[in-house]
Amino acid sequence: YGCGGVQAAVENPELGLINNWLLHIRDIWFKHSSLLGEMPQERRLDTLCELNVMEQVYNLGHSTITQSAWKRGQKVTIHGWAYGIHDGLLRDLDVTATNRETLEQRYRHGISNLKLKHANHK
């Protein structure tokens, strides 16, 4: 995807206050290190971008604002898309959530798809 933020989170250079913004991506790196560690370097950053999107969909879906809206029956939909800087394409990562149940299902499905995608590229 060509995301400089994800690359900086992995390389961890001294960037001052920007490093605080990148901590969450580093947490995702460590959380999914077994999957990412098995991958060739050229696929790691793109996969970390996708994991970051999935984690952010999950976090947003668990926010009190979103949870309250869903409890009230409001039609709130969270989409997980990744934009490729290198090709200008927007990719749907298939983690769209419309309620708490679909949030959990789509998150697990998205992670499983990434593992399967990696297994098929070995």
Segments predicted by a language model, with ranges:
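Divalent-metal-activated hydrolytic enzyme cores
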Residues: 2-122
